[in-house]
């Protein structure tokens, strides 16, 4: 059964456009409360990033959950992985995150976590969708949910992050620049690194509700590159708006993406006898990651794009490390979801143990040229991925790459985009193929 509202990472869209409206969020809170209450007493944590619309949707969800008889614990602005962690430690039935991750402020969305701090199973999301189609009812007044606020949430999460590295760890002498994207990490991330001894310069940590991800963070890394170079820092760390993605910049200003961070973490775990199994990437992971891991005899498998699918593959195989090149990195020995701060700490720990700079560590992975072009499609009824001309062109490019590259066409799970990716050994050839395919996809979408 297909899902009506839930995409690969919850529900997301433009604020004020259905379903990202206060009335829908009220009903969603009620439906979620009813679904979680089927197991008896229900307690739900609610957190958000720094978007101005988060306050509006927080109130709507709170009312809906209470109407269903669910108790609500408000966290305020907190990173998405912090909400997963706190949901677990408070033994709540579920956690709800109000965020649109790396999107601009005029988007927002909802993510759910189970009581174990993992993304909800598909069957629970389908149950919530079925309840959304039913009339909303209110429990009798004596059974209405109560609302409280967790005032020490940030401190709890900071201590948890620090516990992911050995207690004797000190990053004294390490000069960092940290870009918080005016988002949910703006308070906790600087504290974590400073309390571990690093010299931290903070960028973009003055959220006003409208500036989240605006020209900053992991999707706009230019200002971090400049700050690292000007300040002669050892490296820079860029988070996205909700703190589940991380990219880095080495001391030369070069960007270090999720594939490279994943390799550094996996190699460190292997060298210390702590790598359980192999590594999970996605269909978008660079071929160079697969080859570099193969050189170390580390198994590598590809999941569908989306950290929920990476996590599912890790759990099924009982492996520890996986992620996406966009910067979602999951370390199952510490977390139940992608956690940007935890991932950054594991990279810093790996560098410290090897006595390497970030620039040196990334040299062990030789990335293949990869060109990704996003093609926006509107109300066209044509499925570009099923169009005969697109299929034929894709097959021809695959044949031309002669087993030394890949072609991937897929729809985004969160935006009206077709992602055209071509990967191979010759960058000019790869770019030409990607541009030709993207042009064709755009034409059939009209």
Swiss-Prot record:
Q: Which NCBIfam families match?
A: glmM, PRK10887.1
One Gene Ontology MF term: phosphomannomutase activity
Q: How is it modified after translation?
A: Activated by phosphorylation.
Name the protein family: Belongs to the phosphohexose mutase family.
Write down the EC number.
5.4.2.10
Protein name from the UniProt record? Phosphoglucosamine mutase
The organism of origin for this protein:
Pseudomonas putida (strain ATCC 47054 / DSM 6125 / CFBP 8728 / NCIMB 11950 / KT2440)
Please name the catalytic residues of this protein. Answer: 101
Q: Keyword Isomerase: yes or no?
A: yes
Keywords (alphabetical) are: Isomerase, Magnesium, Metal-binding, Phosphoprotein
Gene Ontology, cellular component aspect: cytosol
Q: How is the cofactor bound?
A: Binds 1 Mg(2+) ion per subunit.
Instruction: Give me the gene this protein comes from.
Output: glmM
Phosphoserine-modified residues are where? 101
Does the keyword Magnesium belong to this entry?
yes
The superkingdom listed in its UniProt entry is Bacteria
Q: Which residues bind Mg(2+)?
A: 101, 240, 242, 244
Question: What is the recorded function of this protein according to its Swiss-Prot or TrEMBL entry?
Answer: Catalyzes the conversion of glucosamine-6-phosphate to glucosamine-1-phosphate.
| Names of the cofactor(s) | Mg(2+)
According to its UniProt entry, one GO biological process term is:
UDP-N-acetylglucosamine biosynthetic process
For the protein in the UniProt heading, the enzyme class is isomerase
Q: Catalysed reaction(s)?
A: alpha-D-glucosamine 1-phosphate = D-glucosamine 6-phosphate
Q: Name one Pfam family in it.
A: PGM_PMM_II
